[in-house]
C-alpha cells in the first residue's frame, strides 16, 4: 500500500505522483494506492447530508433501476457471489435528473472522479446511460452503525480496470469501526484506520475484498444518517 498526497485544483484531482505511476502501482503491481485529502471534508459532508435527505423523501426501491436514480436498503446475500451484506446504497444513473441542489453537489464529487478515471484507464465516461454497453454508475454507500458490512467478494477486472473508494465519513466522529479490507497475494490489507475522510483508494478491480462490520454497540436504524459512507465509480454493463 502506498499513500500519496493529493488535492482538488479547479475541479481536477492533482496528486503528488504522475498518473502513469499511479496506474502502474495499482494495475501492474497490484498495490493499494490512497490519494490522501483529495476532497475537502466539508464538501463531502454536504454531499452525504444532501443525499441522505433525498433518500428520506424518495421511497426506497425493491429492485435496481439501472436507468434512474434510486436507493435501496439491502440486507441480503448476493445472488452470484453469495456475499452477505447490510448497507444502504444511493444510485444516480440519471444524474442530470436529480434535484438541482443535490445534482450540483454530486457533480463536485463525481466530475473530478470522471477525470481521474479517464486518465488512469483511458475510458471516457458520461453521466448519461447509453442504450447499450458499459457506463458509469455513480453511487454512495452507507454502512449504518449497528451492523453495516459487506462480505468477501470480487469483481471482473474488465471493463472497470481500477476501482475508486472515496471516504465520505470521519472515523471517530461519524463511526467508530469498520473499513475496507483486501487480500493480495495471501496478505490482508485493512484500511480501517488508514483511509480518512477525503481520501480516494485506487485499487485493481479484481482484488478480493470485504467491508468489516460497523459498531455493534450502536442500535441499528435505517433512518439514521451516521455510519461509514463511501462513494464509488463503478463502470459496467448491467445487462451483459
Task: List PLM regions with ranges.
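Conserved short histidine dyad/triad with adjacent acidic residue
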Residues: 140-156, 169
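Catalytic core of Fe(II)/2-oxoglutarate
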Residues: 160, 169-240
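Cytochrome P450 catalytic domain signature, combining two hallmark sequence patches
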Residues: 52-64
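Short, conserved, surface-exposed binding loops centered on an aromatic residue
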Residues: 128-133, 153-158, 172
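Signature of the catalytic double-stranded beta-helix
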Residues: 39, 74-137
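Fe(II)/2-oxoglutarate
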Residues: 1-30
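Short amphipathic
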Residues: 33-39
